[in-house]
Amino acid sequence: MSPKAAARVTSERQKVLALDTNIFIYHFEENPAYAAFTEELFDKIESGRVRAVTSALTLHEILTGARKAGNPELASLYRNLLGSFPNLHFVAFDVTVADISSDLRARYGLRTPDAIQVATAIHQRAEAFVTNDEGLRRVKEIKVTVPPAAG
């Protein structure tokens, strides 16, 4: 098999995970209950063993948190880090995600941000949506994975 063909097969088999905002926050804050999980997850993403997608809403929520805390330098650091993180793709809110998210919101009574995040995962054909929100397990259109807490 040629190197080009091998690369194509490898990329076709690459696992795609969608990440909720809380996974990033736990990682940045080094939350002891989830530090081992997020460290391993982001190592896999950075090395290319896993490809990650998340809604642009994630960036909005992370930057808002830093700015509300009065820390524009931290917001800038997060923006630069996330914008250049390998194998992480931010997905814009578009009409397709709007359609899917409105259906999820109506069907499951999800809050709008949760519906947008899950709709983004579905639209991107992610294998799973990784979140710490147990309530999202009721969504049947995608596998919802909640990381185990240490301790």
Labelled PLM ranges:
Residues 65, 74, 78-100, 106-107, ...:
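Short acidic, glycine/proline-enriched helix-loop-strand junctions
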Residues 1-54, 67-76, 80, 134, ...:
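Short, well-structured N-terminal submotif of metal-dependent ribonuclease cores
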Residues 24-25, 59, 98:
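A short, flexible beta-alpha/helix-coil linker loop
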Residues 28-30, 122, 141:
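Short, function-defining helix-loop hinge/capping sites that tune catalysis or transport
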Residues 2-6, 12, 39, 88-134:
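Active-site neighborhoods of divalent-metal-dependent phosphate/nucleic-acid chemistry enzymes
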Residues 47-49, 84-85, 125, 139:
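Structured helix-beta-strand junction loops
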